[in-house]
């Protein structure tokens, strides 16, 4: 029987975390927990209820009454209550404002508690900004993905074009730099590499190369 370890994958926006985490989870038959989708779902809740993204108390009060859940599938489905929000939380409106919502300490604390519950049984791959440092500090394998701003903007540009969104590469670079600044400098659970995390620069690597590297590291932990 496969040892059910916890794998934490952190890194900045568009570093390839979610794509790689899904592949790793599928290969290991682990559960994938998309914490970014949880923050996006909370941002969507604020938008839907006309609550300002800066209104921490208002959003926190709504979150207390809201169930966010995942359902497996070829593409993992995300639900807010009974509403499937898988597509809408990837909209540009949500993408451009999620860092504001994610910077609120009470929101991070509430979601971190939920994320820790997901991980109690092990056998999970969780990606985000503070998984290895705050959510799962005892994860058996911690990965920190990096890539240049130019490469990340290019990836996001291709993603947007594939979804039919008009794209401006220079604007995307600017947005990613702004998102990095917010993520790295926020007071509560900023984006940073855990001391025991393994850094992987994905700038010149394919998705499969990154996934295979993490799988090799995971196999060492599982078989140890």
Curated annotation (Swiss-Prot):
It is an enzyme of class 2 (transferase). One of its GO terms (biological process) is pyrimidine nucleotide metabolic process. It catalyses: CMP + ATP = CDP + ADP; dCMP + ATP = dCDP + ADP. It holds the Pfam family Cytidylate_kin. It comes from the Bacteria. Its EC number is 2.7.4.25. This is Cytidylate kinase. The lineage of its organism: Bacteria, Bacillati, Bacillota, Bacilli, Bacillales.
